[in-house]
Amino acid sequence: MNDQNKNRNVLSRREFLKTIGAAGMAATGLTACAGGGNDGASAASAAEIPADRMTYRTNPTSGDKVSLLGFGMMRLPSVGGRSAREGNEEIDQEMVNELVDYAIAHGVNYFDTSPAYCRGKSERATGIALSRHPRDKYFIATKLSNFAPATWSREASVAMYRNSLKELQVDYIDYLLLHGVGMGSGMEEFESRYVKNGILDFLLEERRAGRIRNLGFSYHGDVRVFDHLLARHDEYKWNFVQIQLNYLDWKYAKRINPRNTDAEYLYGELRKRNIPAVIMEPLLGGRLSNVPGTIVARLKQREPEMSVASWAFRFAGSLPGVQTVLSGMTRMEHLQDNLRTYAPLKPLTEDDFRFLQETAAQMMRFDTIPCNDCKYCMPCPYGLDIPAILLHYNKCLNEGNVPESSQDANFRKARQAFLVGYDRSVPKLRQANRCIGCNQCSVHCPQRIDIPKELHRIDAYAERLKQGI
């Protein structure tokens, strides 16, 4: 494995810059085909949301013309106004319908869901919203999310797949993924979930029968599984692969977490095989839209009218071979901002790419915890709100409110911001001091965070702050 790491053919900086140039030409051409009209100079304008300027990419194996912006149905709105991933509130179906209608009216045609999303209710909500539109107006992507050992049998996995068809109200699935390969115990778990039970063979047969139009996988964790599946591409003929990619993970994913793999390598391997890439976590779980103030100022100085988040979406969308970039859009303003970015796309220039790489290097000086707020660690058997604790710490770190000493110039202000904000963000009975170290959370974390260790560290730090350090 060490030799393999040394020999990995990642893109050189020069190759990437050539790639960016090619992507710009391709994006411009596809946009012109999609809508015509002006050059898209007003894409960043808060006043305009073009309805006919979406950028599209064509899947080379199926010919599907897919919107560069994909709607991730993981963070659907709840009746209480929050994401339905949080708490026990019901999905706001009326708002989901409104978001889907608006997205389709503005050129979005790729909708990504899973049996695991929104406490098992995302597929049904997605099916209700999309079934109100002609079937040829959208592509549905869902996953075989057989994470629990109880679902590893052939019968249970087939039942999950059949239920997806029922919940989505369709007789075929446009894009079906093996969900989260590389997680857990890596190769051993992959074999148990998909190979030993014959499920991968079953899915290949479903593709031949036309009930699955495109078959792929989403990857987290053990890169040996990723490499294994690509090495057998001639046999499996993957139609697409979903990877985590953003301007921070491009070169720093492994430094952030040794379990992860730099997006530059993942993307490069797909490009070598001409496999379309579907991008998840373009904002790194929101971290790239909630950056430190110094980074906000840096981005705004370069492009005052563009949102902070749009930089991350432009980075992912500017790469050739990227079929669609997923965004979980809970509110209409999220959808509208992303539409301004991709309708049409203003591809990165070579200078933009260098600028973002320098920005990423600056961000790496902040020692944040790589939590993406995916909530796979929840629920905690002891009631902790794990993501809220980790995200509060990151927020304070980004804002300069994690003092190291009582002698720090802003100690009193930072101490108050951390402790008062902690109590406001996380109820006392759900804070880090309740962690007993059972470790039931860590095994579910796609980022492989040692969650008990981080919780104990944050709790110890909060106690030191209370004592005046």
Question: Which sequence ranges carry the predicted segments?
Answer:
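N-terminal binding-site loop/beta-alpha segment at the start of enzyme catalytic domains
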Residues: 2-138, 202, 208
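Conserved, mostly hydrophobic/aromatic
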Residues: 59, 71, 111, 126, ...
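Structural preference for beta-strand elements that scaffold enzyme active sites
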Residues: 66-70, 110, 137-141, 172-175, ...
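Short, acidic/polar
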Residues: 89-103, 153-167, 223-230, 309-313
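Structural motif corresponding to the early beta-alpha repeats
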Residues: 133-154, 179-182
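CE4/NodB-like, metal-dependent polysaccharide N-deacetylase domain
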Residues: 156-176, 205-209
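Beta/alpha (TIM)-barrel catalytic core signal, keyed to glycine-rich beta->alpha loops juxtaposed to Asp/Glu
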Residues: 181-391, 395-414, 443, 453
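Ferredoxin-like iron-sulfur electron-transfer modules
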Residues: 354-378, 412-437, 456-469
